[in-house]
From Swiss-Prot:
Compositionally skewed regions (Basic residues) per UniProt: 170-181, 626-637
Name of the featured protein: Soluble scavenger receptor cysteine-rich domain-containing protein SSC5D
GO cellular component, one term: membrane
Biased composition (Polar residues): 431-440, 654-671, 687-702, 711-735, 1101-1140, 1335-1354, 1364-1380
Top-level taxon of origin: Eukaryota
GO biological process, one term: defense response to Gram-positive bacterium
Function: Binds to extracellular matrix proteins. Binds to pathogen-associated molecular patterns (PAMPs) present on the cell walls of Gram-positive and Gram-negative bacteria and fungi, behaving as a pattern recognition receptor (PRR). Induces bacterial and fungal aggregation and subsequent inhibition of PAMP-induced cytokine release. Does not possess intrinsic bactericidal activity. May play a role in the innate defense and homeostasis of certain epithelial surfaces.
Gene: SSC5D
InterPro entries the UniProt entry points to: SRCR, SRCR-like_dom_sf
An MF annotation (GO) of this entry: scavenger receptor activity
Tissue/organ expression: Highly expressed in monocytes/macrophages and T-lymphocytes. Highly expressed in placenta and spleen, and also detected at lower levels in colon, and more weakly in lung, heart and kidney.
Glycosylated residue positions: 168, 376, 420
Amino acid sequence: MRVLACLLAALVGIQAVERLRLADGPHGCAGRLEVWHGGRWGTVCDDGWDLRDAAVACRQLGCGGALAAPGGAFFGEGAGPVWLSELACRGNEGQLGLCHHRGWKAHICSHEEDAGVVCAGQRVANSRDDSTSPLDGAPWPGLLLELSPSTEEPLVTHAPRPAGNPQNASRKKSPRPKQAKSTRAPLLTTGAPRQERLRLVSGPHRCAGRLEVWHGGRWGTVCDDGWDLRDAAVACRELGCGGALAAPGGARFGPGAGPVWMDDVGCGGGEQALRDCPRSPWGRSNCDHSEDAGLVCTGPAPRLRLADGPHGCAGRLEVWHGGRWGSVCDDAWDLRDAAVACRELGCGGALAAPGGAFFGEGSGPIILDDLRCRGNETALRFCPARPWGQHDCHHREDAGAVCDGMPLGYVPPTAPTDSNNSTPREAASRPPSTMTSQAPGTAGVSPPPASPTVLWEPGPEAGSPQLRLVAGPSKCSGRLEVWHDQRWGTVCDDSWDMRDSAVVCRELGCGGPQQPDPAAGRFGWGAGPIWLDDVGCVGTEASLSDCPAAPWGKHNCAHNEDVGVTCTGPPGLDSISDPFSWSWIPGLGRDRDAWLPGELATKPSASVTASVLEKTTTKAPGKMPKSTKKWVTKNAKRPTTQPPVMPTTKHSRAQSPPDLTSQTTAALTTEASRRPTSEFTRRPTTEAPQRWTSHTTATLTPQAPRERTTKTMAMLTTQGPQEMTSESTIKSIPQASLEPSAEIPEGSPESPKDPAPSPSVSTTGESGLFRVRLADGPNRCAGRLEVWHAGRWGTVCDDNWDLRDATVACWELGCGKVRPRVGKTHYGPGTGPIWLDDMGCKGSEASLSDCPSGAWGKHNCDHEEDVGLTCTGYTDYDDYPPWTWDPTSREDLAKGTTTAGVPGHTLPWRTTRRPGSSSPAIRRLPDTGSKDGYKLPWTWDTPSGRGLAEGTPTAGKLGPTLGAGTTRSPGSPPTLRVHGDTGSPRKPWPERRPPRPAATRTAPPTPSPGPSASPGPPGPALTSDSSRELTPHSALTSEATSDAPDTSPPTPDPASRTNPDLILTSPDFALSTPDSSVVPALTPEPSPTPLPTLPKELTSDPSTPSEVTSLSPTSEQVPESDTTPDLDTTPYSSTVSEYSRSPDPSPSPHPTTTPDPTMAPDPITTLNPTVTPHFPTTPHPTTTPHPTTITHSTMIPDPTTTPQPFTTITHSTMIPDPTTTPQPFTTMQPTTTPHSTTPHPTTTPHPTTITHSTMIPDPTTTPQPFTTMQPTTMPHPTTTPHPTTTPHPTTTPHPTTTPHPTMTPDPTTTPYPTTTPDPTTTPHPTTPDPSSTPVITTVSLPTSLGTELSSPTLAPTVKPSLHPQLTFTAPAPHTSTSQIPTLEPSPALESSPSRSSTATSMDPLSTEDFKPPRSQSPNLTPPPTHTPHSASDLTVSPDPLLSPTAHPLDHPPLDPLTLGPTPGQSPGPHGPCVAPTPPVRVMACEPPALVELVAAVRDVGGQLQRLTQVVEQERQERQALLLGLTQLVEAARGLGQLGEAVKRLAEMAWTTSMPAPTTTTPEEEERPLRGDV
């Protein structure tokens, strides 16, 4: 008995569990699992719920295998008891009742844990005789079609489903099946007023068809006169369709309508838009529509596909990249990633994101890994991920996706349904009845019968055509099916051509064939028998049955060859310009949420009037039983969405309220026979639902553009009156209060240019206007729920939020029904207040404002709990689709987001956001350059019925209005523009600030030697103006750096900045470069004490000064004589004048000049155009044969005075010198000062260094030529008499400087290293004293050792001084100096004179020869004035410092004056005491000073020589060490080889002595080969 009792109990349990149903899913084979037990429907807890349990449930429901087993109330929370928990199926049970479980109602779960099921959708073939149902077996049509980017879009279209974007199916460019030819057409044609100036219609896909142009408010065609591939290429590019394949004329895609706007188009092929091509005036042509031009473009390549799944919307995700299909790794793969992929594929939302090669392992490369989508991207390519092809996965980790949509033409199987009209919530209290009917949505299971009910397949009415077009966008387009032997079957495409299509279209009353030759399978694979093959119509037959063909059922085809036909449309009606749009028919078809072809799309009758439902029950055929009472109470309050103005849409949509359900199946079937369609076939057909919905009660309202109403009927839909049956309850009422939104000129930024709908979902309550919207979603029917209250948008907390609340929100938004949510914050956290919490809708309210909830703003939530909502679709056809193809961005854009291809227009729907409001969450559409790439700059505002910039209230009559395009509040960030939106100005790139010149660099920047060098303006260069720049302040300013560059011009030449060396280029010209300008910058303000003016005599040749001039930044470039003034102007100007001040040099101040060593002044140098004068002080150094050296010399001038002192002074002096301007130079030079220091010696070769100093002066003085200074240095070299310097100036021509490198030779200058200051000087030196070897200006510093003189102070030009490497080569003359040889070793010396010139650039970095014209040297003459300053500045004093303190490399010695005619000037020309052309007192002429200078230079030369020797010795030691290392390496290598040989021998010996052990493993055998030493 106990056994019997157990068996009985088991049987009872099984019987109870046999009754299953799936509720609230996208179709009958997916949803929340509910079980009938104890007279009530209840749910199943997700504890222990997995794919094995789901597989048993799916099998029991007749829905094939299980794809996913989501928990967590994925399909919404159910009602009633939780019957089962902890199910533990093995997966092979026949019924869920056979699985072990915890017991009936034994659980610890809540409805938040309700389990769901996603089945493959394959129905067992027990409901019909044949197994040809589309549900049987094979994967869905076209889903696996392999399309290469070059092929047309897949022929099979995705099922346009209600997923958040009903239009997805048609708008996606995925490699997956595309909606037959029309998926794109409607997008291109709806919204004429939009900015998309071109569109293609009547073609096989969106990138082929008859070309139409929008102009004058109308669409018109293009005449084919002169139309060729070049014209087509421009049009294809403008449309975003790639290249042109063909340019057919002769109305190849059918004749158009309206005006012929363009004729005789003559594009060259490179134009940006068709309107830019030569053509006849608008509207003037000699053509008719039989000559309409067409296009066939390559079209965008497919990007995604789902392979090896049960249908096209489930499978392994594959991506097309690099010419191959590859898979996606499941690392980090989740529902958000799958949601993006499903949306891009046009398959709605994501139900599951299986990994682990759930759908089998792919082949080919793994294209993507670590995808991290947020869930609201429009395409997978916008999600963060590793670079293409980079991964760490194997194909066993291939990711898959299960979408809630079905491919076009796919009818999900319906599990047995319970016929009682109850919703899941209500069903709990009502036992199921025995009646059954097919329910597309939530499939109910009739308790007794466990197997699905078999429905008969309706055939055509008597006398009607025995054929039909299904799975297409309209009744006149789709897959051809023929009725025979009481069954519908397909036709094979063998031998099918336009003549056969013509017969079919004529028989169906659909006009003529519209497209040349629709590819087979374009409208999906059919099911059932293939009735006809090898049809051979002549084209004149009255019926397809009259055409010759193979015997019925005889064929050699498969369903992938099913014929598709597209006709122009009924001849009696205006053809629909976009016949391929899809209508959302909630109550039709077996899938309550299925998108069916828009055969409803018939031109609305003019007599259509607004009406309100008196009777709320709609007889939607096939609709699953649902209680209609929930919608009865508040229908009148239901706001409506207004359709956009679509000139091209000549049809309207008929719809019944989303939740209205059929009362009985019988009623549905009886009325369905009026037309020959098989509305009741198990798969959706193209038949207009109204045909069979005689009982459907619909509200008809005229569509007005931008109409807004706060009071409207329960639903605004349009329907051809002829299609309404007498049984429909329609009450004629005054037209709904629809009023167009305020008129704004279309071109104005505030006017919505897009006729997009502006649905109004505002209601007026006690608290004022109530608005709701969905933000940050892919379209207006999906996103984060936001509510307008108290002047602000806020969010809704998800506490207690359930399906009933969501249903009311979707209804209020006019977005149909609720789709399964994907996480509470699927659309991200919002901003602003959280207005509502604890919502408690019953589901029958017309607005959320009617539902009980907490007080406004009272909540215990944060934005992580914001409600996200995804509705099924749109309730008004005219509002569909909300996306349109934008040729500019080449993407589908939300209506109003951007105008297609029309530059210069602002977003039609841009509206101002409330001041202070956060910037709208922006979702980037494809190809937008915006950095906030993922958000749309707008959100759908239900009250206003248009997209608004996020954060802005809608322009409701009762609330703040926002004109489309109104400006944003000042503080709010601008909304992002989609790529195609050319209207709004682009954000300017952040301005790039020009690099600021280094403060310390002086001479280099002076590159503009020419100007400064120019003899003409020598004086001016030094004018007070330049002095101004020379002023310590100016110099000092970091600007002193190249900034001050323009010797002549205030700003240094960029070149100068970059190549300080240029300044030193030629001895005379040394400072001519812009560096002079730099010099000013160099002048350090700090250098307070002006260097004692060197004896005016120090000033070198005017010629040299001229060069200096070029150096001086301020230059005024002419610095020459003027330079002096400039220097004067500068506090240190006087110093600059120094050259005149030559006498000063002798004073210790001169040494001060040394400080000038440009080092400090370097900046000064920069400052100094004036600085140049500074060098003038140094003039003597300038004199130093090397102009380069001179530079230092200039500093040295002081040396003349007391070279050594100023060496010491160098730094400080330089600074004071800045007073002259040059002084700043000095400042820089400080390091240089040491010039005399050994450092320079290191540079020894750098006599050129001396040049450097010269350079410095050059800048300032230009004229001053620091030559004077140089002389000081020079003397040192050979030019014992600082006169040499003078000659140097001659040399100054500094051409030598150019040679500056030549200066290098000046090694004599080396001693000059003292000139190190030269760097500083450099600026001046160059300029200064060209005569006195102005060349010295050239910065030899870098010379000999390639080190820079301390003179770097010259920074810009003098820079070399800072870097010993900067060889400032003095002119060859310097080389003449006895000491030059010494310096020769140094790098600077290496350079030939010409090179010196390069070196001159003072900056070791810039070696380019900056040779200013020697003529400049004369210009330098003026510098004399500067001489005083420069003299002091240049004082070689630094030299002394240099040797002791500065590193030799830092301050390469200036060549001992290198007065030698480096540049070719002979020291003799002027004679040691020759005064510059403009009489200048040259300190160099004073024997005592010269003697001291020469002595100092020689000392430095000796030091440099010694240093060179040490360096050479070290180099040799390093070479020896390197050689030893090399030998050691060789030895080691030899040992290794030896070891290898020994091992091989040992191995051979081993093998010979012992037979190879059979047990030896390959690894063991190989080991000896690897052996280590």
